[in-house]
């Protein structure tokens, strides 16, 4: 445990894939600060294990961090938040890839799709359990310049982490559950069109991930141009 600033900031090395470590973190936080009122689960790794039938151990590692790391955080911290009778927030960091599922990193898409479903379920369960006292929210960043970006310099199309936080605070104040962030290349209208197309794959009985299917390439281009 490292004290970064006297009395108000602690950094604790934690393997979020291990529930016991989150329990230990929770105890340390409560000893230092008392009951938690804001829990932000920002666990994520972006390694690509490959195709759906490959590298099971690597798939497991990614899901253990990206999904189970968040579940562990909620299960370690939320019970005491509920018991405190104080207002609170839970923010889980998702991804647009968990909604539109672009081919490429299938395991990452899986983890973020499951996280979206989990956070939706969490929000509903909290509303039933305590009304509006503790709310859950899904942060869906756009292209953001972080250590996972892999670029030495910020790409022009990316937002900074600070921009994402400012947008998050604005949307939390408005009461949004889905905090869908734009970036410097993709606006909300574009995101909405892409997401609607993805949902229409089910409704219209198109092939899975038809946006990237050669038979639908021209139709998707016309659809996006018509907005």
List where the protein language model places each region:
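Active-site loop immediately N-terminal to the catalytic Tyr-X3-Lys motif
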Residues: 102-106
